[in-house]
Amino acid sequence: GWATTATEQGMGAMAREAARWVIGPRSFRRLLPAFGWLGPLAMGRTSHAFVAQVKAILEVDESVAEQLEQVHIPTLVLVGNQDILTPRGDSEEIADRMPNAELVVISGAAHGFMVEHATTFNRVLLEFLGRITKAQRAAVADVDAKAS
């Protein structure tokens, strides 16, 4: 796996191997010339830190999922419909467990959707933040009106 590759061959080799998992097939071909960012990004951390991250992800248990029900703040859950690292079903479960979560599935995107579909990602995020800001302002105005 990636942890073994990182440990035995270094972070550069891991980044090359991971790229095909993080970016969808069509986007991979389109973005291949721009992949210069992935190597330095991966090289910025040690293989030890990466292996610890992989281990932590693999050790997550059901108690973490159960705690999601306690998250009541507005939450945006994003997933690419071609994401094989964190599949759509996982994101659906996360959103279903959180009382104020909104799920958005980005068509044609894999795990690296914020890079491969940056325009869509930014639009969806800004729209969500705009709705949250508007709702918070309305709530504050309502409290102020009741206090008067």
Regions found by a protein language model. Give the residues of each.
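Short, conserved loop/helix-junction motifs that constitute active-site signature segments
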Residues: 68-72, 97-98
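Short beta-strand/loop motif that positions the catalytic acidic residue
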Residues: 71, 77-79, 83
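Flexible "cap/lid" loop of the alpha/beta hydrolase fold
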Residues: 1-10, 15
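Acidic, amphipathic alpha-helical patches
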Residues: 64-68, 91
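Conserved alpha/beta-hydrolase "acid-adjacent" motif
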Residues: 84-90
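Catalytic active-site module of serine/aspartate enzymes centered on a nucleophile-bearing elbow/loop
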Residues: 100-148
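Hydrophobic "lid"/C-terminal helical patch
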Residues: 18, 54, 94, 121, ...
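Hydrophobic, aromatic-rich cap/lid helix
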Residues: 38-65
